[in-house]
């Protein structure tokens, strides 16, 4: 059986931290920002952690 390939799209969107959690960027923060308030745009530029229910799936995709 051949080796599993990592999912190239997932590798560009998610990063594994040193503690084993998975980081992601928030959506809706790249354009059309003129109608979003400053507090929201600041929050959208911060990265966050992936939910624990999806973490195992994403790790399998990026660390394969």
From Swiss-Prot:
GO terms for molecular function: structural constituent of ribosome. Residues 19-41 are annotated as: Disordered. GO terms for cellular component: cytosolic large ribosomal subunit. It comes from the Bacteria. Residues 25-35 have a biased composition (Basic and acidic residues). GO terms for biological process: translation. SUPFAM superfamilies: L35p-like. Keywords: Ribonucleoprotein, Ribosomal protein. Belongs to the bacterial ribosomal protein bL35 family. This is Large ribosomal subunit protein bL35. It comes from Chlorobaculum tepidum (strain ATCC 49652 / DSM 12025 / NBRC 103806 / TLS). The gene is rpmI.
